[in-house]
Amino acid sequence: MQGHLPAFLPDVHEIREDAADYLGECLAVDQGIGILLDELSRKDVLENTLFVVSGDHGIPGMPRAKCNLYDIGCEVALAARWPGHIKPGRVVDDFVNLMDLAPTFCEAGGIAPPETMTSTSLIPLLESPASGQIDSSRDFVVTGRERHVHVARDGYLPYPQRSLRTKDFIYIVNFEPDRWPMGDPEGLDDPSTPAPEYEQLAYNTMVAYADLDASPTKAWMIHHREEHDVEPLYQLAFGKRPREELYDLIHDPHYMRNVAEDPAYANVRKTMQERLFQILQEQNDPRLMEQPCRYELEPYAGPLAEFQLPPSKQSK
């Protein structure tokens, strides 16, 4: 793993080991997929099954990953097998959203998707014999975030973000830049504050920066946050962020240099902003269209209510 970590992670043994553990989990998932395929084959239905594999978010417990709108937080694997429909060995470059899977399964099963589904079936992409970019309109994807851990910030406040990702750029709007993106630091923004015990940070998400899952990487970075080489990476991971972020992924694949205020990128920023806000308006996104936004208020924000099944659903 040495020399292969993203540039925003310290290349030290503890973090390499944490990353290797994650890759080990990926291998375990791969083995599990093999078992499922074998079972479908044993039941003689494999050749008549649309089999799709993906994930729900990026790497947990890693800075800038899960619970962030950077690639390592949103980009997931997506592989599909459907004999007679999908030509094997193809790689498709179109941007898709996992919401697209629901109408895809509806179409594959011969039923019309409900009108409430605003996503688009992937069947044309799956059945195309081509690789690369197939549908020219799928040249972007929009992602968003409101909350992860409900107590991450004082007052149960979310950290609202929306982003537009294209082939060469990612543009992010942080609607409340005065809030802490990874949750309140519990004093750790002050270098003189002693760090909690390493084991606490590695295994208890709620100790500090609760929107970043507990992990050895989180613990190591907090314990070494004052070191000269670590402090800039610590700020990228845990510090407050400006309202707008723009990254040139061709020259900055690990999104380390925010060029939103760079005059050389003014036209790109304007184009990305206008396109993102147009999409959010078309979707009637409450974060853009409402004042106050409903996501700041209960039941979307606030303490978790105790959930109880209605009497008709409770076991007798």
Regions inferred by a protein language model and the residue ranges of each:
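Active-site His/acidic residue clusters
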Residues: M1-D18, H57-L69, P263
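A long, amphipathic alpha-helix that forms part
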Residues: L5-T49, A108
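A structural signal for well-ordered alpha-helical segments within the folded catalytic domains
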Residues: A20, L27-G34, V96-P103, M117-P124, ...
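Beta-strand elements within well-structured catalytic alpha/beta cores of enzymes
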Residues: C26-V29, I33, L40, L50-G55, ...
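Histidine-centered active-site microenvironments of extracellular/periplasmic hydrolases
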Residues: E39-R90, D94-N97, T118, I134-S136, ...
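C-terminal cap/loop subdomain of S1 sulfatases and analogous C-terminal strand-loop tails that border
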Residues: I59-P60, G109-E245
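Long, internal low-complexity/basic segments
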Residues: A219-E244, L249-K316
